[in-house]
Amino acid sequence: MKVRLVFAGAIFFLMACSARAQVTGDVIGVHDLTAGSKSPITGARPGSCTYCHAPHSGIGNAPLWNQTLSVQTYTPYSSTTSAQTGNAQPPLGKDSSLCLSCHDGTVAPGQTVVYGAVTMTGSMASPDVLGTNLQNSHPFSLVLPIKDSVELAASLVSQGKTTDPTGAVKLILGNIECTSCHDPHVQAKDPISQNFLVRDSSNGQLCLACHDPNRTMTGTVNPLNGWTAGIHTTAVNKTIAQANVGSYPTVAQNACLSCHLPHNAAGAARLLRGPNEQACLACHAGGSNLSPSIPNVFAEFAKIGHPFPAGTNAHDTAESLVLNSNRHATCADCHNGHASNQVTAFPPPPLTRASQNGVAGVNVSDGVSAVNPSVNQYENCLRCHGTSAGKAVNPVFGYLPARAVASGDFLNVIPQFAYSSTSSHPVTHVRSSALPQPSLLTNMLNLDGVTQGRSMGTEILCTDCHNSDDNREFGGVGPNGPHGSRWTHILERRYEFSQAPAPGQLVTNLFPNPDLSVNGPFALCSKCHAANQIMSNTSFSEHARHINDGFSCSACHTAHGMGSTSGTTISGERLVNFDVNVVAPNGATPISYSRASNSCSLTCHNHAHALLGGATVIKPLRK
């Protein structure tokens, strides 16, 4: 009787294999290791099923397993943001362990339990060999129970089910295993990727069975929020195979796979195709990878741009919002790839731009507390340019004036832009000066210096001054944003700074009778301020004289704002804050400015400026 039962089982096993093989032809694809198959590694033994299964005398568990199991200890996936804990190991003989008996690379295919070592020719494709360090592979065989997290589908924990409407993506005994996503017997259920997936995974359908971008939990930010309408979900740009951004024909169809790899990812902690910003290179570095092509962002960094991080200061999603010692500027610091979008009409300042949807920022009121996600663009900039420690003057950005009125941390722009500041450009608050603004244009000028751009409004953005010199928003053809510019300090347009060998001495870079057009040395100021008004001395009687003599606005005016002028001899209206690298005191009289008398006292370019009879008298110094 026992012999008959075994024989019947063997017949059933072989019939099942035969029946499965006849479903759509060569359904097991490269898992058919027999000679003449499409697999890169083939063996001398006939019978495609027998490389994995044995009708009897195998390991003896449910799949009738025949391939020798790997007994390695694995280094599981981990990250600073994962809610899952513990040293997860795939249980020996269970689903994932069976897959790893070939795919960890420590046991050669063909090492069968029943038939011994089968002679094999060729080798497995390198992307299919995972090794024993699984930190760069999607987590599986988790320590149960699965820990809930805002980006996971609620049903995973509450019901032990995915949200896949087809039911193909499923938990295995309450856990995520290889067979949650892969069917080892059918290679082409997804006819494009042909990665033995349990279903078609175009448009991220397989990933979205477990990951929910729309879920909310009190007090927690979902990092996937915004995905549904994001540019990486909707972009119809065609991709080519050489781009290495997935198998599908468009960015939207590749979806998650445009940036992430479930196995052997180069950026392990986030399963990125490349480490940190390198994951963005495939699409955002120009070339023919996308059609139609998109602006080459990475070319901007070759100009004067935000510095790329070194290997020791990479971005981490769990890092402090205020970047102190670990200072860096990666794509992910300013952009959230899940929520980033593209629009043809921009919201009014100071609201964040669609390309920065979902990024974190810092509250301007204290410079420390989180605003996540940012509401206003400047909140994201303040992660580095606010109260953070470790800021330093970077020579690559060019000459930096030293102001007569300056706080202890002169690189902290928060007090400079503050509403309480005597005067400031209206970045973190609405324009509030009671003084007339005769030079202020109704609309900003585009890069050509002629056509009108955005309405001036009552607030401006950081990127109105710090932007690509060829940005699309103001009439160029390049990328928007402060990635890089040919002008110093990542300024959108040319702006020359007056410089002198010592305070009060001759300025060495004068621009007499300057070109006040878009090509001139002060083009940035002309974006918002009418040059003819300034040259008409409508707000100060010496404007035309100073400009025609070749002095820069920077000798007398600061760009961001004054901060507190308490205890100083400078009243601070109209951003008057002298560069003390250029000007010096006039004898014993400290550097001073009075808006009430519209006059100053200082020495500049070997000329003494002194208050006399309610006006400034300028005289050359005696030699």
Q: Predicted regions span which residues?
A:
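Bacterial N-terminal signal peptides that target proteins for export
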Residues: 1-9
